[in-house]
A protein has these predicted regions:
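C-terminal capping alpha-helices of c-type cytochrome domains
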Residues: 100-105, 128-152
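Electrostatic cytochrome c docking/interface patches
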Residues: 26-71
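Bacterial signal peptide processing site
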Residues: 10-14
Length: 152
């Protein structure tokens, strides 16, 4: 029996000395810096680049071009005036949202839903993500002209 105890004790071998290269100490939760929140204003996240619009055209030709964009991009499949379809009612859109916010939502809806609290609430209430339809910077003023012409 003593032989067994001797063999077991010797089999353990020497214990390594603790070194400073061992696992790093874990910081207490209070010492870990919090992730900063993104501050978003009424225009949406400013890291989404948009074309600055000095003026939204209101002439009939621009409004007509905007309707073509609205139809070609399939906007009417989800949006209407005076009623809610899949997406929000567009009546009075420019009185509820800023032009930069609308541009950002149309041109980068995924980022808006992730970073903008208003877009997140719209996503929650409508239960569907607005798809990115590829509206170009050149098409945007015409699309806004059409939307604004339909009702404020």
């Amino acid at each position: 029996m003593s032989l067994i105890l001797l063999l077991v004790a010797c089999a353990e071998g020497p214990k390594p000395a603790a070194t400073s290269a061992s696992a790093p100490a874990v910081k207490p939760a209070s010492a870990v810096a919090a992730v900063p929140t993104v501050e978003v204003g009424p225009d949406g996240p400013t890291e989404i680049a948009i074309v600055a619009l000095a003026d939204i055209p209101s002439d009939p030709a621009s409004v007509g071009e905007g309707q073509k964009v609205f139809d070609a991009k399939g906007c009417g499949g989800c949006h209407a005036w005076g009623s809610k379809l899949v997406g929000p009612d567009l009546t009075g859109l420019s009185t509820r949202r800023t032009i930069p916010w609308i541009q950002r939502m149309v041109q980068d809806p995924d980022t808006m839903t992730k970073k903008d609290p208003v877009a997140r609430e719209l996503f929650k209430s409508h239960m569907i993500q607005m798809p990115k339809q590829g509206v170009t910077d050149a098409e945007m003023p015409m699309l806004l002209a059409f939307v604004n012409s339909k009702g404020k």
